[in-house]
Amino acid sequence: MMKLENKLHRVLCSLHQNSISTHKTYVAVAAQDEYVRMGKVSLPRMYAVKPRIQKNFQDNYRFYGTLLCICWLYFFIWYPFALLALMVGVFLSFVMHGLGSLTINQNIRLDPKYSIPGVCAVTLIVIMFLAPVGRLFWSFCIVSSFAGLHCLLTTYENPAGIL
C-alpha cells in the first residue's frame, strides 16, 4: 500500500508545474511570480541544483582533475619561474600549517588562520609578476568555465528545469 501511495505522490508531484523533484524528494515551491514579488527569483532553484552539481563532481572528479593538470602544465611549461614560485608558496603554506601558532614576542603572534592566506596572496602576486596575467587567467577561465558547464549540462536528473 505504501509503494502505491509513494508512486501516486510522485506522479502527482511531477505533473504539478510548481514542483521541483530532487533525487527522491519532491519539494513544492511557490509560483514564479510570487518569488518575483518577494524579490527571490533564484532561491527556489538553487537548493534543487546543488545535489545534482555535487553528484556530477563526485562522478567526474578524475576528468576535472585531468583538465586542471593539463591547463596548469600548459601554463607552467611556458613560464617555469611561475611554477617555482607556486611550489615555494605551497611549501611555505605547509610549513606554516605544520608549525601551527607561533609566538615570537609577546606582541608578535603568527596564527595559521591568518598567515596561510597571507602566504597564498603573496604567492599569487609573485606569480602574476612572473607571468602575463592574461595567460594565467586564461587557464583559470578555461578550467572553471568548462568544469562548471560540464557539471551543469550533464544529464543527471535535471531537477531545477533550468536547462
UniProtKB/Swiss-Prot annotation:
Name the residues that span the membrane.
61-78, 82-104, 114-134, 136-156
- At the top level, the lineage of the source is Eukaryota
Q: How does it sit in the membrane?
A: Multi-pass membrane protein
Q: Which UniProt keywords apply?
A: Meiosis, Membrane, Transmembrane, Transmembrane helix
Location, primary (coarse class): membrane
Presence of keyword Transmembrane helix = yes
Subcellular localization is given as:
Membrane
Gene Ontology terms, MF aspect: small GTPase binding
Name of the protein in question: Meiotically up-regulated gene 109 protein
Q: Which organism is it from?
A: Schizosaccharomyces pombe (strain 972 / ATCC 24843)
